[in-house]
């Protein structure tokens, strides 16, 4: 499972979904799905834009969470 840390990163910078959407041009719905970790797929361009905007590494935004079977 891929874990998205967008909500944590946005919280640290005190950014709202509207702020990120407005400043990056990314659709608000896309940001919302990433924020709430309900996105099933996302364009790499979106991930790149978010990382550049938040000045973070890909590994800060996304992580693979190993399942315990």
How should these model regions be labeled?
Residues 26-41:
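Recognition helix of helix-turn-helix/homeodomain-like DNA-binding domains
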Residues 62-69:
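Short, charged recognition helix plus adjacent turn
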Residues 1-18, 23:
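A short, Lys/Arg-rich alpha-helix, primarily the initiator
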Residues 22, 36, 63:
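Phosphate-coordinating loops and pocket residues in cytosolic domains that bind phosphorylated ligands
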Residues 33, 37, 49, 67:
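Alpha-helical DNA-recognition elements
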Residues 45-60:
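DNA major-groove recognition helix of helix-turn-helix/homeodomain DNA-binding modules
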């Amino acid at each position: 499972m891929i874990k998205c840390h967008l909500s944590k990163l946005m919280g640290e910078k005190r950014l709202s979904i509207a702020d990120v959407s407005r400043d990056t041009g990314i659709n608000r719905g896309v940001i919302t799905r990433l924020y709430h970790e309900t996105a099933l797929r996302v364009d790499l361009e979106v991930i790149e834009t978010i990382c550049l905007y938040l000045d973070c590494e890909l590994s800060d935004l996304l992580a693979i969470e190993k399942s315990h079977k």
